[in-house]
């Protein structure tokens, strides 16, 4: 009985025809025999919905990242995949951002528009971007900061534009903002509204370098840990300008025209660790360094300092600082290194951390 069953199974297999590779022409012949023409089949295929989001022409899409950089685009591409989390449009020729350019991009976290020709952004252009965290608009032709930026924004970079005004209203409600980069713009001190940055409660980093400002912007938020104002036209550091910056750890004021630092200025930054005052017009070491508990790095090279006192950097006698210096630079000043008492740097961590050199 078993043998009979096996024989029948083998016979059934042997009756089956061999596998044949079939092409589009074979299916078209079948359609012709069944009364379905090739045109009907083509229309049927065209009517099918796409299986997933379509990548814009010439762009590259991978893992919710849409890269459309370096394509010579003059506008934002249409029909961007709605699940996009990062959109890269840098190095194009886009001149304007319009309402609706980013519709349906509710999952976008980062938008890169660097190095375009953008001079206009419609007030509601970024409204659909309810999850946007990073907005990069550097190297464009913007004269003002964009309005109605998403409240989720954490990082804004708009250096190398044509911005002349920073209004307080632009940053209202941006409570998640951490980084603001405004360098290399034709900004003047009068163009920054008093307290423009005050409303951003989490703001940690501001860079306004290589502009025309002559004073430290007033009303900076107490949350700041880094303030970079290098390459400006600041002439003086007064105590009021640093008041309330209790969390500031790094202050960059290199390449300005600062001739004086008011007494008490550094006392307003009790947690300062790095102070960059090189390439200015200082005639003496700023007061208050010896009493500062945490400061570790002080750059004073390329100034007009002609004398250094034995207590300018360290507490009197051999009282120890909370933190020892790890870097002190005084080279390219009129003061001669042999005129400085060895005990002046008694609170420096290692001697190699001191850079004196000669004045040229």
Swiss-Prot record:
GO molecular function ontology, one term from the record: glycosaminoglycan binding
Subcellular location field: Secreted, Extracellular space, Extracellular matrix; Secreted
Record note on modification: The attached glycosaminoglycan chain can be either chondroitin sulfate or dermatan sulfate depending upon the tissue of origin.
LRR repeat residue intervals: 74-94, 95-118, 119-142, 143-163, 164-187, 188-213, 214-234, 235-258, 259-282, 283-305, 306-335, 336-360
Function: May affect the rate of fibrils formation.
Entries under InterPro entries matching the protein: Leu-rich_rpt, Leu-rich_rpt_typical-subtyp, LRR_dom_sf, LRRNT, SLRP, SLRP_I_decor/aspor/byglycan
Pfam name, any one: LRR_8
Keywords: Disulfide bond, Extracellular matrix, Glycoprotein, Leucine-rich repeat, Proteoglycan, Repeat, Secreted, Signal
Complex and partners: Binds to type I and type II collagen, fibronectin and TGF-beta. Forms a ternary complex with MFAP2 and ELN. Interacts with DPT.
Record family assignment: Belongs to the small leucine-rich proteoglycan (SLRP) family. SLRP class I subfamily.
Origin: domain of life: Eukaryota
Name listed for the protein in its UniProt record: Decorin
Lineage: Eukaryota, Metazoa, Chordata, Craniata, Vertebrata
Signal peptide start-end: 1-16
GO cellular component assignments: extracellular space
């Amino acid at each position: 009985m078993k043998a009979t069953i096996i024989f029948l199974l083998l016979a059934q297999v042997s009756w089956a025809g061999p596998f044949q590779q079939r092409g589009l022409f074979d299916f078209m012949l079948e359609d012709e025999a069944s009364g379905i023409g090739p045109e009907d089949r083509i229309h049927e295929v065209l009517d099918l919905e796409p299986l997933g989001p379509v990548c814009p022409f010439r762009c590259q899409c991978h893992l919710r990242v849409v890269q459309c950089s370096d394509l010579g685009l003059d506008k934002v591409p249409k029909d961007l995949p709605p699940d996009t989390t990062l959109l890269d449009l840098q190095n194009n020729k886009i001149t304007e951002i319009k309402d609706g350019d980013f519709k349906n991009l509710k999952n976008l976290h980062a938008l890169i528009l660097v190095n375009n020709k953008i001079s206009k952004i419609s007030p509601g252009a970024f409204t659909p971007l309810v999850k946007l965290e990073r907005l990069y608009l550097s190297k464009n032709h913007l004269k003002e900061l964009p309005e109605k930026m998403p409240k989720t924004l954490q990082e804004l970079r708009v250096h190398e534009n044509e911005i002349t005004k920073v209004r307080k209203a632009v940053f209202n409600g941006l409570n998640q903002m951490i980084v603001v980069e405004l360098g290399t713009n034709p900004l003047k001190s009068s163009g920054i509204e008093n307290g423009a940055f005050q409303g951003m409660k989490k703001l940690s980093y501001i860079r306004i370098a290589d502009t025309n400002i002559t004073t430290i912007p007033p009303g900076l938020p107490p949350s700041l840990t880094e303030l970079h104002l290098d390459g400006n036209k600041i002439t003086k550091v007064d105590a009021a300008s640093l008041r309330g910056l209790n969390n500031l750890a790094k202050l960059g004021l290199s390449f300005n025209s600062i001739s004086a630092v008011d007494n008490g200025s550094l006392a307003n930054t009790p947690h300062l660790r790095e102070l960059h005052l090189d390439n200015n017009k200082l005639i003496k070491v700023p007061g208050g360094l010896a009493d500062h508990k945490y400061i570790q790095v002080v750059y004073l090279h390329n100034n007009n300092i002609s004398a250094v006192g034995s207590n300018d950097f360290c507490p009197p006698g051999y009282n120890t600082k909370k933190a020892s210096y790890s870097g002190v630079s005084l080279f390219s000043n009129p003061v001669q290194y042999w005129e400085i008492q060895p005990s002046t740097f008694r609170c420096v961590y290692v001697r190699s951390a001191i850079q004196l050199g000669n004045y040229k």
